[in-house]
């Protein structure tokens, strides 16, 4: 009897627990991608594996360490470029008055000067670049001499390499050589036709057309703008002042051309 009563009580207890019980789903059956959407970041990090957390921390530290030197190098390069820009602007401001004056007087030379910074020779040796710029002014005359008289051009090139003056100061030497080439032609023109010679020197002078003798007397007292602009003409005019006292220049132009040129001494 007692066993039957105990079995009945056990069945009643099981029935009562079955009616009051609720079904609880297991968390392991839910997908892991849904959990971080409903939990805060700190809670989701707590569910990660410790190895994953250590890996993420290591990656963050490595990224911060690698980015810091790159940022420092970029700042140093920017600072260096800024210093170079400031120095270049200061140098340009020093040369602005001279360049502005050069642009008004000679635009072609000003444009050549603007290319100075892009010329490797100018950056390495400014003096050599200036001599090269001066030599380029005489290239057309030398090219014309090479076409008209190749032998004279070759002789001049040989003298250019052997003359101490040509080695020390090539532009001055070329000016003297060109003066020696121009003076005979102008002297011959002055002896053959003084009026045409004076017209060639000063085409806008009316006194030259009307009275050449009066002009020859007056040119020793007045300033010649062409002589100021062209040193070759200035040297030739100084030489022509000795023309009335030179018998060979009036009697024999060939002997006059063989005499030493006085105008070359001013260089």
Swiss-Prot record:
Family annotation (InterPro entries): Maize_Zein_Storage, Zein
Family assignment from sequence similarity: Belongs to the zein family.
Domain of life (superkingdom): Eukaryota
Remarks, miscellaneous: The alpha zeins of 19 kDa and 22 kDa account for 70% of the total zein fraction. They are encoded by a large multigene family. Structurally, 22K and 19K zeins are composed of nine adjacent, topologically antiparallel helices clustered within a distorted cylinder.
Species whose genome carries this gene: Zea mays (Maize)
Name this protein carries in UniProt: 22 kDa alpha-zein 14
A Pfam family that the UniProt record links to this protein: Zein
Keyword entries, A-Z: Seed storage protein, Signal, Storage protein
Role summary: Zeins are major seed storage proteins.
Signal peptide: 1-21
UniProt cross-references to PANTHER family, sorted A to Z: 22 KDA ALPHA-ZEIN 8, ZEIN-ALPHA A20-RELATED
MF-aspect GO terms: nutrient reservoir activity
Keyword Signal set for record: yes
